[in-house]
Curated annotation (Swiss-Prot):
Organism: Chlorobaculum tepidum (strain ATCC 49652 / DSM 12025 / NBRC 103806 / TLS) (Chlorobium tepidum)
Region annotation Domain III: where it falls in the sequence: 154-201
Name of the gene: ruvA
Annotated GO biological process: DNA recombination; DNA repair
Description of how the protein assembles with itself and partners: Homotetramer. Forms an RuvA(8)-RuvB(12)-Holliday junction (HJ) complex. HJ DNA is sandwiched between 2 RuvA tetramers; dsDNA enters through RuvA and exits via RuvB. An RuvB hexamer assembles on each DNA strand where it exits the tetramer. Each RuvB hexamer is contacted by two RuvA subunits (via domain III) on 2 adjacent RuvB subunits; this complex drives branch migration. In the full resolvosome a probable DNA-RuvA(4)-RuvB(12)-RuvC(2) complex forms which resolves the HJ.
Name of the protein in its database record: Holliday junction branch migration complex subunit RuvA
UniProt-annotated stretches for the region Domain II: 65-143
Recorded family membership: Belongs to the RuvA family.
Entry's free-text remark on domains: Has three domains with a flexible linker between the domains II and III and assumes an 'L' shape. Domain III is highly mobile and contacts RuvB.
GO cellular component: cytoplasm; Holliday junction helicase complex; Holliday junction resolvase complex
Region of interest called Flexible linker, as start-end residue ranges on this chain: 144-154
Protein origin, superkingdom: Bacteria
InterPro entries xrefs: DNA_helicase_Holl-junc_RuvA_I (IPR013849), Hlx-hairpin-Hlx_DNA-bd_motif (IPR003583), NA-bd_OB-fold (IPR012340), RuvA (IPR000085), RuvA_2-like (IPR010994), RuvA_C (IPR011114), RuvA_C_sf (IPR036267)
Length: 201
């Protein structure tokens, strides 16, 4: 719904920020890392956003850079990981530290984070390691194509879920397609995923 918000930073705390845009104050949930990096209240700021919608609530999550936003969205693809836990992960470690722990298969680094147990840490590594390696072979956090690859995965996943397919089946199909054919567009990935899902039924 919103790609980003640009406006005056009205208030900021460890977990929330209010940004005023054209007279409207938007409440955004943020990581502690983003909170530390924000400019003083009253400054102009731009935050990338993720609009989370469920039956009983709507929430906006804010990020200073696209890399943190895309990792947040990747975490949401894991069963049992909601936005609150994803934010806890991003608050516990930097994006680079999380990626390094995933690539190096170090679950103990992740289960030191509040709310992340051994099973959840292992699941994060199991489900995200190949994705991180694919978009970031050196695990340096500086691969130019990383945000685009993560966005493609997110867009294809959203399209399939809109069509009524469950997230686990959709993500499995997308991951398999991106592994064998990394240069496809979103539309091509969705078409190939539809074929793969139907063939598995």
């Amino acid at each position: 719904m919103f790609a980003f918000l640009r406006g005056e930073l009205v208030t900021v705390s460890r977990e929330e920020a209010v940004v005023e845009v054209s007279g409207i104050g938007y409440l955004l949930h943020i990581s502690s890392g983003t909170s530390r990096r924000l400019p003083p209240e009253g400054s102009q700021v731009r935050l990338f956003t993720h609009h989370y919608v469920r039956e009983d609530a709507q929430q906006l999550f804010g990020f200073l850079d696209e890399e943190e936003l895309q990792l947040f969205r990747l975490l949401l693809t894991i069963g049992g990981v909601g936005p609150k836990l994803a934010m806890a992960v991003l608050s516990g470690l930097s994006v680079g530290e999380i990626q390094e722990a995933i690539v190096a298969n170090r679950p103990e680094t992740l289960y030191g984070i509040t709310g992340v147990g051994k099973k959840t840490a292992s699941r994060i590594i199991l489900e995200l390691r190949d994705k991180i390696l694919k978009i970031q072979p050196a695990a340096s956090g500086k691969t130019a194509g990383a945000p685009q690859a993560l966005q493609l995965n997110e867009d294809a996943l959203a399209a399939l879920m809109t069509l009524g397919f469950p997230k686990p089946a959709a993500q499995k199909a997308i991951s398999g397609i991106l592994e064998t054919s990394p240069g496809l567009s979103v539309e091509e990935v969705v078409r190939a995923a539809l074929i793969a899902i139907h063939n598995n039924f």
